[in-house]
Structure formats: structure tokens, C-alpha cells
């Protein structure tokens, strides 16, 4: 066994690139600390000034923060604003011919949308929604769409007329779609006939038909269909209408609706512990302000930058860093249809080269997969345009971080390892690329104005090196405002467990460790923490250690009941290059992985079971379905919805291995 040097690598400090830092918005740690001090000195003044300077208001707000009905906080009270106006109209004077969106379809089609073109298309779409479908301010519109430019038109058209959009990821099942439609009581559903994935048509309209059959969603009056792959689909007379046939008859002038700062902008449903999805409700002004500020601070976005976030718009990352953040800044955002692996694993690197991408934001899962499937693929492309790299969605292990830093960033790009959630609206903890010394797999410090702390259950601060609960102890503008239609669930979910100075604080649900320098490392969900003989061990920490073995391409660890220890560790391991091992080799490999764990974490962290599998079950957003793996490890029947999986055959292959081992 050749245990790599990642343990030492993880301790290494990387300072920002000097040339980049000189021109960055926040150039050094002194400037960062000045901003933090400014926010701490006068919290409301800090946020109020940012809102005045960065957003365009129809009517100024008269109160920065209203905490009278905490935790239902109100920001920028009585201000009037429109998000669509801030993302498009205000840029037209100086940037009407600037590219707003670059789109690349999976079949090789290509589209460039200027801000002037975006303005025209959004206005026509907004008029279509108003005039033909009677969509009004406050109505909910479900968007069940793939990654195409029309999806952005739909989002911004809704915001222009004051409708509340709720995007449902295009990989969700008809049942999941139905649940979200009914919870939101949506008036209109927008979808596409289909899209393209891995070179083949992938149909969406049949899922909508199934969701709506037998009047299962009585609030829905009409459905609007965008033709993308032009395959034969069934239409329901009187309900289904074709966007492409109607939109060009509409005027390209549509005055933006004056919205209150606190008017809901969108709902985005997340998984809930009860099984019922939670409709996370975000406001207009506060959300947009933080989307713009984090683009400026975390990505140091510049006028000529081409920004590429690989997330789907069905997730919060796609909302904030594909659409609203880049467009609020007047930047150019890239949209990609399809997968990273079609036609080959060089697709992303070719795009970075071809479109001269400056700032690149993706998930650790994608990085690990690209590393495993095409470790040397990036060397075939010119990636010199890159200035900042970012990761999102889960903790990134040092092995993946190192490859990303060295091979993609050429050891010159800061990696902004961002921590945030659907509920936070935007980044909460992150390095600043021109200022923050970074460490592999460390989210580093809270952003200015954000009070993130690691606390014990009794509200006391943890000591350096101790694991605790990551909390946010003061309200911030982009925070979740409510769970749609369920105030009690909002309080129970986020403001009912940990108190500081007698007041409940926002509980993120993530575990974290803070070091003596204040740097925060995310351990993972607190429900992804395994209690082994009284010792709380984060599965992400175990996965990071196992991944250091030279034969391990990827792994996922879950806790299983153990009569002696309470819980044991069960690992699903994907070997590099599809390698296989016999019984003797597998026992030796288990021994070697446990040696790494004893060195990295301690002898208490020991794998009890290992299953070598061809792949891990992942959603189309790249998230590993750990609950599913836990059911398999515990030999329970699978009850999870598999419709969101990238490849359901992976589960079948794992189950066949289980049957062989029984």
C-alpha cells in the first residue's frame, strides 16, 4: 500500500495568488477584518448601506430590520423593488449588447443571449403568463424544466409580474412533482416536452401528465409546454398549450411589478425528516442582495468574467449562482444541458477552454468522479483562463481538493470551499479568493455580516478542535422566511433547539469544528454522524480518510446498528478504474483502510463492513443517496423514491452483490 501524503497536505496553508489579490475587491485579511468590524459595530447600518448601494429601488425602505416577531424577521421594510428589473433593466443603459447567457446543448447546439435579448424574451414571456394564463401577483407557478435558456426566461418572467415560482428538479418523479404542486397550490405548471441526456431524448411531459391525471392537482388550470426535443407527445385539449407557438405574438414591453421587499420571490422544496417536502420561502430584496454580494466577494466577479456554475436550476445553487447572482451583477453566466460525461469526460474542460471561463463552481462529487474517470483529461485542454475555483454541496476530501487545485487550477487559483444551504439563500462561510489563506477541505471563515458559530447543545461555544452544532446567531437578509403554509414547522425546524443568551438561534443541522484561528471545517449533517461506543464520528471525515487509499476512487459510509458499540461503520467502496479484488485482497484492503482511519481519526474509527461496488447511487445533482445505502446496509427493504437517480442500474448492481453475499 502507498498511503499518499494528503494528511500533511491537508495541514498546508495556501495563500492567495499575489497578482490576483492586488486587483481583488477584498485584497487582504486586514480588509476582511475591517468589514467584519464594520458589521459588528453597527449591524443594521452595515446591511442598510449595502442594500442602498447595490440594489435599485422603486421606493426606499424605511427600516433595515424588524425583529418584533422573531424568528419571522423582516428586512428592508416598506421598500419597493423588482428582482427582474435588477437582473436585466438596470444593465441595459451600459450593457445591452453584453452577453448575459451562453447556452450549450448536449447535441452541440449553441446560443448566446445578450441583455437586450434577455429583456425582450423575458418581457414577452411575462406578457404571455399575464395575458393568456391570467397569472397575477402572488400566484404560484411550478417550473418543471431542464437546463435550457427558456427556464431562465420563465423564472424572470414570474419575478417581473410578481408571481412566485417554484422550480421542481426535472429528474423528480410524477409523485414528487404532484406533492409540490399541491403544497404550493400552483395555478400554472410549465414544462418542456423533454431534453437530451447522454445523447438521447429524455422526456418530461409524460411525468407531468401522470402527476396531473385524475384531477390529482385541482389548483392547476393550465400547462405551458416548451418544445425542446420535438418528440411526439400527447396533449390534453384545453389544458396544454405550446410556448413556442404563442410567445412571439406577445409584446416585448412589460412594466415590472412593484414588489415589497418581503414579498416571496420563490419557493424551493427540500427533503424533510417527516417525508413531506418543505417549501423553503425566500424574499425578494434580502435574497437578491446576498446573491449579488456573494458573487462580488466570494467569486470577485468582474465585468468581463464568464462565470460557470454547473448546478441545475432545480437546486438553490442553480437559483443563486446560475441565474440571480450573475445577472444581478451584470455578468455572463453559462448554462449547460446534459451531463459531464457525454460525449466524454473532457466535456467540461473543453467548455472552460472554449468559453474562456474565469470562475468555475461545482460539487465535490463531480470533482471526485472526474478525477476517477479521467484523471489526466484536463491536461489536454487550456485552462489558463481560470482565476477562481469553487466547491459546493458537501464537504470535499483532501484528495479531491488537491487534484482540483493542482490539475484544474494549475496551483494558482484559490478554491472557495463554500458552506451554505437552501435555507440561507447564499454563501455563509467561505474563503475570499484575494484575501483568505486556505486549507484543503476547510470552509474557513464566516463572511462579513454573518454570525456563524459552533455551539454545544447548551448554547456554549465549543473549544477549538471539538465538534459541535453549526448555528447562525443573528438574522441575515437572505435567510429563509418561512416554510410555505407551515409556520410551526419553520420554528420547529430551525429555531427550537439551541439558545444563546436566552434566544433560539438558527440551527443548520450540520456539524462542524472550529480551530484556534477561527477556521471552520464542516463535518457533515448531524444526522450523518455515527455514535461509535460513545464517540461521535462524522461519516464525511471517515470517507475523506478512506479516499486517501490509492485504490479507492470513491466511497460512502453509513452507520449501522451494533449490539456492542451502538453503531458500526459500513463502507461502500468504488475501486479505481473498475478494479476488482478477491477475498484475500479485499481483507488486505480493509486492513489498510482501517490503518488509515486509525492514523487519521483514531482507533475508534474502524470499518466493520465493506462492500465493493461498481458505483454509488447519486441524484442527477450529484448527491449520494445515503439513506438508500443505509437501508441496503441494514438489509431493509428499499422504500426510497429512485426516480431522481442518475443511474438506477447502480442500485440493481449493488442489490445483486448483496444477494450473492447472503
Swiss-Prot record:
SUPFAM superfamilies: Acetyl-CoA synthetase-like. It catalyses: acetate + ATP + CoA = acetyl-CoA + AMP + diphosphate. PROSITE patterns: AMP_BINDING (PS00455). Its cofactor is Mg(2+). The keyword Ligase applies. CoA binds at residues 197-200, 317, 533. It comes from the Bacteria. The modification N6-acetyllysine is found at residue 623. InterPro entries: Ac_CoA_lig, ACAS_N, AMP-bd_C, AMP-bd_C_sf, AMP-binding_CS, AMP-dep_synth/lig_dom, ANL_N_sf. ATP binds at residues 393-395, 417-422, 510, 525, 536. CDD domains: ACS. Catalyzes the conversion of acetate into acetyl-CoA (AcCoA), an essential intermediate at the junction of anabolic and catabolic pathways. AcsA undergoes a two-step reaction. In the first half reaction, AcsA combines acetate with ATP to form acetyl-adenylate (AcAMP) intermediate. In the second half reaction, it can then transfer the acetyl group from AcAMP to the sulfhydryl group of CoA, forming the product AcCoA. Belongs to the ATP-dependent AMP-binding enzyme family. HAMAP family: Ac_CoA_synth. This is Acetyl-coenzyme A synthetase. The lineage of its organism: Bacteria, Pseudomonadati, Campylobacterota, Epsilonproteobacteria, Campylobacterales. The gene is acsA.
